[in-house]
Amino acid sequence: VTEVHRYTGFAALAASAPEDALYTACEANETAWAMAVRLEGFAPAEYRSIQDLRQLSEAERSPRRLEIAAAAAHHGLRFFADDELVSVGSGRGCKVWAVHSLPDPSTIDWEHVHDIPVALITGTNGKTTTVRMLSAIAAAAGLMAGNTSTDGVQLGGDMILEGDYTGGEGARVLLRDARVDIAFLEVARGGMLRRGLPVETADAAYVTNIGTDHLGEYGIDTLDRLAEVKLLVAKATAAAGTLVLNGDDARLAPALSAKRSVAVLVDPQELPAHGFVRHRGRLGPVNDSRFVAWLEQADIPATLGGAAVHNIYNALGAMAVAVQLGIERGAVVEGLSTFASDSHTNPGRCNLFDLCGLRVIVDYAHNPEGLEVILQTVAALRPQRTLVVIGQAGDRDDASIDALADTCVAHAPDYVIVKTMEKYSRGRDATEVSQRILQRLRDGGLPDEHLASAPDEIAAVHDALEWGREGDLLLLLSQADRNAVLQLLESLRATAWQPGSALPCERTEGLK
């Protein structure tokens, strides 16, 4: 199969190939493009010769690998392969071999190979928090849970790999670990577009929401197209799994017509026939239009007493997925009510610090929708004054940067510090994005005396803490130096630092 997808300003060529010829096919694709470019009179980039492609094909060829893949499919089991390892089954039921010592499929003890429950979590915002809520629920059920996220691969309470592992590599590492009883995989847009789904089958999948982030990349330039990408997880649940969707998201609601789909809703005007909802401040399932309250929103620390509505959605999604995976009510309630969502269990995701009356929230919000929900949370907490530290990476287009600034303006904070994110400039001048945000804030009506800039995140946080007083709330949008920011705040809380007093660090330093 060969397909051409045309987008604004570019095109993508896709071709199918056997399992043991995919890398060669990709290189052949590049070579074909380079030759076409040369025929048009342009100088192509470096590419492989036909002889190189033949050698690559021979090196990649592995009939035994294909035989094992076919046998795994016959037994209804997951199959993973990469440059070094081949495996069948998953978690505690996994068998793994080096690519150069693959067994005859007939010699594999298939009775002792099995799969573990796997859920996929995707969407624009809320993915990482949801997989961590699910891991807490599974732990309460006595299961060894593993998860992948933008922070790494986590098993139980231990981070076994650090970095962005929201693609296939993280899934393979986790699902080849024989200690894992159940797995929750954060699935990012980029990974799906580059490599596809990390697993072919999943027992459940949850799509949190659709928002304006990374538009313009890989030909995805509208929210409807982005929704199509996020809903690719439905392919993994099509055979026997359950698709959980945010039913309040207009771009996801139509997909609820699919078989075995479940909606999560916050304060619906009418109870659905089935689903998981917040109703009168309580969370629980709805069956045959009858609501059963499992716990109060105030009993879920991540919701900050109900102020953090986005975490109510995350909790409902986690609840729905857990139930689909067969986890009992008691474990769901215990997991959600004991998940602190603090700087240790969920770093950088709506972490609230109380510094002797000065409240500080550290959050990863980096798109307009994420900023909107965290600013709504701030408003619900009713501070005397509000300060926002804001910045953005350089790979967002101008419209997305402007929208982030406009969202901030709409909530009329008392003070805004715009940070420069030099190591995330990604092709722009170091201060280009911060200067654009500052100007957009001015254009939106924020006076100069309510605005400031800082050369980096640490300096911005230092200035924010010097500004804050008892009764205020500081919203620190932290990406570049999150760990240092959290360490500083933990130290200030532990030493009962008083707002208005000297800080234990210089403006350009982290914690001493």
Describe the predicted segments one by one:
Residues V1-P117:
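Preference for protein termini
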Residues V199-I210, R225-L231, V262-P268, L438-Q439, ...:
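A short, gly/pro- and small-residue-rich
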Residues A72, T148, E186, T208, ...:
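Residue-level signal for inorganic ion chemistry
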Residues L155-S257:
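Flexible active-site lid/hinge loop adjacent to a nucleotide/diphosphate
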Residues I220-A227, L231, R260-E372:
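Adenine nucleotide phosphate-binding catalytic loops in nucleotide-utilizing enzymes
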Residues A308, A320-G330, E334-K512:
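ATP-dependent carboxylate-amine ligase
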Residues T237-T242, K259-V262, P413, D448-E449:
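A short helix->loop->beta-strand "cap" motif at the edges of active sites that frequently abuts
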